[in-house]
Amino acid sequence: WASFLIKTPSQKIYMAGDGGYDSHFEEIGKRFPDIDLAILENGQYNEGWSLIHLMPSDMAKAAKDLKAKKIMTVHHSKYALAKHPWNEPLTNEKKMQEQDSLNMMIPEIGEVMPL
């Protein structure tokens, strides 16, 4: 669903966009090693939408496949499109950060995040 990589002289930033988990994350990680920041969606997921939105269990897998140094999550805490509680993605992210030892940036709505 239209992911892209921004490469500057000092950083590589990968923006996943909407999309489910598959082998493309591993392929991107191999093709573009040393990704500094991966921006991954987390929210508005549903088993029926797993091809167009990352499921919580797949976000950590995608992050590890990309081998990104840091992860920032987006696509959460706005309005309820899916049936999960609006704050469930943030709760899941904090658990993943601890369980999977991910270096995550978890911005609140409107928070400025230096890259």
What are these regions (language model features)?
Residues 12, 22-109:
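Cap/insert and terminal regions of metallo-dependent hydrolase folds
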Residues 1-17:
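Conserved beta-strand hairpin/beta-sheet module of binuclear metal-dependent hydrolase folds
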Residues 110-115:
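A short acidic, often aromatic-flanked loop/helix-cap motif at beta-alpha or helix-coil junctions
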